[in-house]
Amino acid sequence: MPELPEVEVTRQGISPHLLDQQVTGLTVRNASLRWPVPEVAQQIVGQTIRGIRRRAKYLLLDTDAGTTIVHLGMSGSLRILPKSTPVEKHDHIDLELASGKVLRFNDPRRFGAWLWCELPEAAHPLLAKLGPEPLQSGFNVDYLAKALEGKKKAVKLCLMDNHIVVGVGNIYANEALFAAGIHPQTEAGRIDRERLTVLVAEVKQILAQAIKQGGTTLKDFTNADGKPGYFAQKLHVYGRGGETCTQCGNLLSEIKLGQRATVFCGLCQPR
Protein backbone atom coordinates (compact mmCIF):
# COMPACT_ATOMS: atom_id res chain seq x y z
CA MET A 1 0.00 0.00 0.00
CA PRO A 2 1.38 3.46 -0.87
CA GLU A 3 2.25 5.29 2.34
CA LEU A 4 2.98 8.98 2.92
CA PRO A 5 6.31 9.09 1.01
CA GLU A 6 4.82 7.38 -2.04
CA VAL A 7 1.83 9.73 -2.09
CA GLU A 8 4.11 12.75 -1.66
CA VAL A 9 6.36 11.54 -4.49
CA THR A 10 3.25 11.23 -6.65
CA ARG A 11 2.16 14.76 -5.71
CA GLN A 12 5.55 16.16 -6.61
CA GLY A 13 5.50 14.32 -9.93
CA ILE A 14 2.06 15.40 -11.11
CA SER A 15 2.08 18.98 -9.79
CA PRO A 16 4.06 20.64 -12.62
CA HIS A 17 1.69 19.12 -15.18
CA LEU A 18 -1.55 20.03 -13.38
CA LEU A 19 -0.99 23.43 -11.80
CA ASP A 20 -2.92 26.20 -13.61
CA GLN A 21 -4.21 23.72 -16.20
CA GLN A 22 -7.83 23.79 -17.29
CA VAL A 23 -9.66 20.47 -17.04
CA THR A 24 -11.35 19.65 -20.35
CA GLY A 25 -12.86 16.29 -19.46
CA LEU A 26 -13.22 13.50 -16.91
CA THR A 27 -13.57 9.98 -18.28
CA VAL A 28 -14.64 7.34 -15.76
CA ARG A 29 -14.37 3.85 -17.24
CA ASN A 30 -15.05 2.03 -13.98
CA ALA A 31 -16.75 3.87 -11.13
CA SER A 32 -16.63 0.86 -8.80
CA LEU A 33 -13.73 1.84 -6.58
CA ARG A 34 -13.66 1.67 -2.78
CA TRP A 35 -16.52 4.15 -2.92
CA PRO A 36 -18.38 4.71 -6.21
CA VAL A 37 -17.08 7.69 -8.16
CA PRO A 38 -19.89 10.26 -7.72
CA GLU A 39 -21.53 12.04 -10.64
CA VAL A 40 -20.64 15.36 -9.00
CA ALA A 41 -16.97 14.57 -9.68
CA GLN A 42 -17.69 15.88 -13.19
CA GLN A 43 -17.91 19.39 -11.71
CA ILE A 44 -14.14 19.65 -12.09
CA VAL A 45 -14.60 19.84 -15.89
CA GLY A 46 -14.05 23.41 -17.08
CA GLN A 47 -12.25 24.33 -13.87
CA THR A 48 -8.62 25.39 -13.52
CA ILE A 49 -6.49 23.47 -11.05
CA ARG A 50 -5.23 26.01 -8.51
CA GLY A 51 -3.26 23.69 -6.24
CA ILE A 52 -2.18 20.10 -5.68
CA ARG A 53 -1.84 19.20 -2.01
CA ARG A 54 -1.42 16.12 0.13
CA ARG A 55 -3.21 15.47 3.41
CA ALA A 56 -2.18 12.18 5.00
CA LYS A 57 -2.42 9.68 2.12
CA TYR A 58 -4.98 11.74 0.21
CA LEU A 59 -4.19 13.93 -2.78
CA LEU A 60 -6.25 17.11 -3.10
CA LEU A 61 -6.74 18.81 -6.48
CA ASP A 62 -8.05 22.30 -5.71
CA THR A 63 -10.28 24.35 -8.00
CA ASP A 64 -12.51 27.38 -7.44
CA ALA A 65 -15.58 25.09 -7.49
CA GLY A 66 -14.33 22.42 -5.11
CA THR A 67 -11.67 19.80 -4.49
CA THR A 68 -11.11 16.38 -6.03
CA ILE A 69 -9.93 13.92 -3.36
CA VAL A 70 -7.84 11.00 -4.62
CA HIS A 71 -6.67 8.00 -2.60
CA LEU A 72 -4.36 5.39 -4.14
CA GLY A 73 -5.68 2.55 -1.99
CA MET A 74 -3.67 -0.68 -2.02
CA SER A 75 -2.34 -0.63 -5.57
CA GLY A 76 -3.29 2.64 -7.25
CA SER A 77 -1.03 4.92 -9.25
CA LEU A 78 -1.32 8.21 -11.13
CA ARG A 79 0.58 8.92 -14.33
CA ILE A 80 0.82 11.90 -16.65
CA LEU A 81 0.45 10.69 -20.24
CA PRO A 82 -0.34 12.04 -23.72
CA LYS A 83 -4.09 11.86 -24.29
CA SER A 84 -3.48 9.49 -27.21
CA THR A 85 -1.82 6.83 -25.00
CA PRO A 86 -3.75 3.54 -25.38
CA VAL A 87 -5.82 2.56 -22.37
CA GLU A 88 -4.57 -0.49 -20.48
CA LYS A 89 -6.26 -2.85 -18.07
CA HIS A 90 -7.22 -1.20 -14.77
CA ASP A 91 -6.97 2.35 -16.21
CA HIS A 92 -10.20 3.46 -14.56
CA ILE A 93 -10.13 7.27 -14.78
CA ASP A 94 -8.66 9.96 -17.06
CA LEU A 95 -8.55 13.62 -16.04
CA GLU A 96 -8.12 15.40 -19.37
CA LEU A 97 -6.17 18.66 -19.54
CA ALA A 98 -6.03 21.56 -21.98
CA SER A 99 -2.35 20.75 -22.53
CA GLY A 100 -3.31 17.56 -24.37
CA LYS A 101 -2.17 15.37 -21.50
CA VAL A 102 -4.19 13.26 -19.10
CA LEU A 103 -3.82 12.33 -15.46
CA ARG A 104 -4.55 8.59 -15.60
CA PHE A 105 -5.62 6.64 -12.52
CA ASN A 106 -4.78 2.93 -12.58
CA ASP A 107 -5.89 0.68 -9.72
CA PRO A 108 -5.81 -3.13 -10.16
CA ARG A 109 -7.39 -3.90 -6.78
CA ARG A 110 -9.89 -1.00 -6.86
CA PHE A 111 -9.41 -0.02 -3.21
CA GLY A 112 -8.61 3.54 -4.23
CA ALA A 113 -11.00 6.48 -4.35
CA TRP A 114 -11.89 9.47 -6.55
CA LEU A 115 -14.26 11.85 -4.77
CA TRP A 116 -15.48 15.46 -4.93
CA CYS A 117 -15.80 17.91 -2.05
CA GLU A 118 -17.38 21.38 -2.13
CA LEU A 119 -16.91 21.97 1.60
CA PRO A 120 -13.63 23.15 3.07
CA GLU A 121 -11.80 19.84 2.77
CA ALA A 122 -10.94 19.86 6.48
CA ALA A 123 -14.65 19.27 7.13
CA HIS A 124 -14.86 16.22 4.85
CA PRO A 125 -15.58 13.02 6.86
CA LEU A 126 -12.39 11.38 5.56
CA LEU A 127 -10.20 14.29 6.64
CA ALA A 128 -11.89 15.90 9.63
CA LYS A 129 -10.36 13.79 12.41
CA LEU A 130 -6.87 13.23 11.07
CA GLY A 131 -3.82 13.80 13.27
CA PRO A 132 -0.89 16.08 12.42
CA GLU A 133 1.44 15.65 9.47
CA PRO A 134 4.63 13.92 10.67
CA LEU A 135 6.92 16.18 8.65
CA GLN A 136 5.40 19.38 9.99
CA SER A 137 6.24 21.18 13.21
CA GLY A 138 2.99 20.12 14.91
CA PHE A 139 4.36 16.60 15.23
CA ASN A 140 6.90 17.01 18.02
CA VAL A 141 7.80 15.39 21.31
CA ASP A 142 5.41 17.58 23.31
CA TYR A 143 2.51 16.56 21.09
CA LEU A 144 3.43 12.87 20.98
CA ALA A 145 3.98 12.61 24.75
CA LYS A 146 0.51 14.04 25.35
CA ALA A 147 -1.10 11.88 22.64
CA LEU A 148 0.38 8.67 24.08
CA GLU A 149 -0.11 9.48 27.76
CA GLY A 150 -1.74 6.57 29.58
CA LYS A 151 -2.08 4.44 26.45
CA LYS A 152 -1.51 0.71 26.94
CA LYS A 153 -1.69 -0.02 23.23
CA ALA A 154 1.51 -1.13 21.47
CA VAL A 155 3.52 1.84 20.24
CA LYS A 156 3.63 0.51 16.67
CA LEU A 157 -0.16 0.50 16.51
CA CYS A 158 -0.21 4.08 17.80
CA LEU A 159 2.25 5.20 15.12
CA MET A 160 -0.08 3.70 12.51
CA ASP A 161 -3.18 5.37 13.98
CA ASN A 162 -4.15 8.28 11.70
CA HIS A 163 -5.89 10.00 14.60
CA ILE A 164 -2.49 10.30 16.33
CA VAL A 165 -0.23 10.97 13.34
CA VAL A 166 -0.99 10.52 9.66
CA GLY A 167 0.76 8.60 6.94
CA VAL A 168 3.12 6.39 8.98
CA GLY A 169 2.13 3.00 7.60
CA ASN A 170 3.56 -0.42 8.26
CA ILE A 171 6.83 -0.03 6.37
CA TYR A 172 7.92 3.18 8.04
CA ALA A 173 6.59 2.32 11.50
CA ASN A 174 8.81 -0.78 11.48
CA GLU A 175 11.81 1.21 10.31
CA ALA A 176 11.35 4.15 12.70
CA LEU A 177 11.02 1.90 15.75
CA PHE A 178 14.16 0.00 14.77
CA ALA A 179 16.09 3.23 14.29
CA ALA A 180 14.88 4.49 17.68
CA GLY A 181 15.67 1.19 19.44
CA ILE A 182 12.09 0.73 20.64
CA HIS A 183 10.35 -2.66 20.71
CA PRO A 184 7.13 -2.44 18.64
CA GLN A 185 5.06 -4.07 21.40
CA THR A 186 6.10 -1.55 24.08
CA GLU A 187 3.11 0.07 25.76
CA ALA A 188 2.98 3.52 24.22
CA GLY A 189 2.26 5.32 27.49
CA ARG A 190 5.36 3.86 29.16
CA ILE A 191 7.91 5.32 26.75
CA ASP A 192 9.90 8.10 28.40
CA ARG A 193 10.37 11.55 26.90
CA GLU A 194 13.99 10.91 25.92
CA ARG A 195 13.05 7.93 23.76
CA LEU A 196 10.03 9.74 22.33
CA THR A 197 12.34 12.56 21.26
CA VAL A 198 14.45 10.04 19.35
CA LEU A 199 11.36 8.40 17.86
CA VAL A 200 9.97 11.69 16.55
CA ALA A 201 13.32 12.52 14.97
CA GLU A 202 13.59 9.08 13.34
CA VAL A 203 10.05 9.21 11.94
CA LYS A 204 10.83 12.56 10.32
CA GLN A 205 14.25 11.49 9.05
CA ILE A 206 13.07 8.19 7.58
CA LEU A 207 10.03 9.67 5.85
CA ALA A 208 12.11 12.52 4.41
CA GLN A 209 14.75 10.08 3.17
CA ALA A 210 12.10 7.84 1.61
CA ILE A 211 10.64 10.80 -0.29
CA LYS A 212 14.12 11.73 -1.50
CA GLN A 213 14.60 8.15 -2.74
CA GLY A 214 11.30 8.21 -4.63
CA GLY A 215 9.39 6.07 -2.13
CA THR A 216 9.43 2.33 -1.59
CA THR A 217 8.47 -0.03 -4.39
CA LEU A 218 7.75 -3.55 -3.16
CA LYS A 219 5.23 -4.60 -5.82
CA ASP A 220 2.86 -2.06 -7.33
CA PHE A 221 4.07 1.47 -6.65
CA THR A 222 5.38 3.63 -9.48
CA ASN A 223 5.67 7.40 -9.60
CA ALA A 224 4.04 9.76 -12.10
CA ASP A 225 6.69 8.82 -14.68
CA GLY A 226 6.08 5.10 -14.21
CA LYS A 227 9.37 4.59 -12.36
CA PRO A 228 9.81 2.65 -9.09
CA GLY A 229 11.04 4.08 -5.80
CA TYR A 230 14.38 2.99 -4.40
CA PHE A 231 13.99 3.26 -0.62
CA ALA A 232 13.44 -0.53 -0.44
CA GLN A 233 17.21 -0.84 -0.80
CA LYS A 234 17.60 0.97 2.54
CA LEU A 235 15.12 -1.05 4.60
CA HIS A 236 16.67 -2.46 7.78
CA VAL A 237 13.81 -4.59 9.12
CA TYR A 238 10.63 -4.45 7.03
CA GLY A 239 10.29 -7.62 4.95
CA ARG A 240 13.46 -9.10 6.48
CA GLY A 241 12.10 -11.41 9.17
CA GLY A 242 14.53 -14.28 9.83
CA GLU A 243 17.45 -12.42 8.26
CA THR A 244 20.35 -10.91 10.19
CA CYS A 245 20.15 -7.51 11.84
CA THR A 246 22.17 -4.88 9.99
CA GLN A 247 23.41 -3.49 13.33
CA CYS A 248 24.25 -6.50 15.49
CA GLY A 249 23.94 -9.64 13.35
CA ASN A 250 21.16 -11.12 15.50
CA LEU A 251 18.30 -12.85 13.65
CA LEU A 252 15.33 -10.55 13.16
CA SER A 253 12.02 -11.66 14.66
CA GLU A 254 8.67 -11.40 12.87
CA ILE A 255 5.25 -11.33 14.53
CA LYS A 256 1.75 -10.19 13.67
CA LEU A 257 0.66 -6.99 15.39
CA GLY A 258 -2.72 -5.59 14.46
CA GLN A 259 -2.80 -8.16 11.63
CA ARG A 260 0.30 -6.56 10.09
CA ALA A 261 3.75 -8.07 9.71
CA THR A 262 6.04 -6.61 12.36
CA VAL A 263 9.79 -7.17 12.21
CA PHE A 264 12.28 -6.19 14.91
CA CYS A 265 15.61 -7.05 16.51
CA GLY A 266 15.24 -8.40 20.02
CA LEU A 267 18.71 -7.14 20.96
CA CYS A 268 18.61 -3.66 19.43
CA GLN A 269 14.97 -3.16 20.45
CA PRO A 270 14.66 -4.68 23.95
CA ARG A 271 11.17 -4.84 25.41
Curated annotation (Swiss-Prot):
Pfam families: Fapy_DNA_glyco, H2TH, zf-FPG_IleRS. Keywords: DNA damage, DNA repair, DNA-binding, Glycosidase, Hydrolase, Lyase, Metal-binding, Multifunctional enzyme, Zinc, Zinc-finger. One of its GO terms (biological process) is base-excision repair. The keyword DNA damage applies. One of its GO terms (molecular function) is class I DNA-(apurinic or apyrimidinic site) endonuclease activity. This is Formamidopyrimidine-DNA glycosylase. HAMAP family: Fapy_DNA_glycosyl. The active site is at P2 (schiff-base intermediate with dna), E3 (proton donor), K57 (proton donor), R260 (proton donor). Its EC number is 3.2.2.23, 4.2.99.18. PROSITE patterns: FPG_CAT (PS51068), ZF_FPG_1 (PS01242), ZF_FPG_2 (PS51066). PANTHER family: FORMAMIDOPYRIMIDINE-DNA GLYCOSYLASE. The gene is mutM. Gene3D superfamilies: 1.10.8.50, MutM-like, N-terminal. Its cofactor is Zn(2+). SUPFAM superfamilies: Glucocorticoid receptor-like (DNA-binding domain), N-terminal domain of MutM-like DNA repair proteins, S13-like H2TH domain. The keyword Zinc applies. Belongs to the FPG family. Binds 1 zinc ion per subunit.
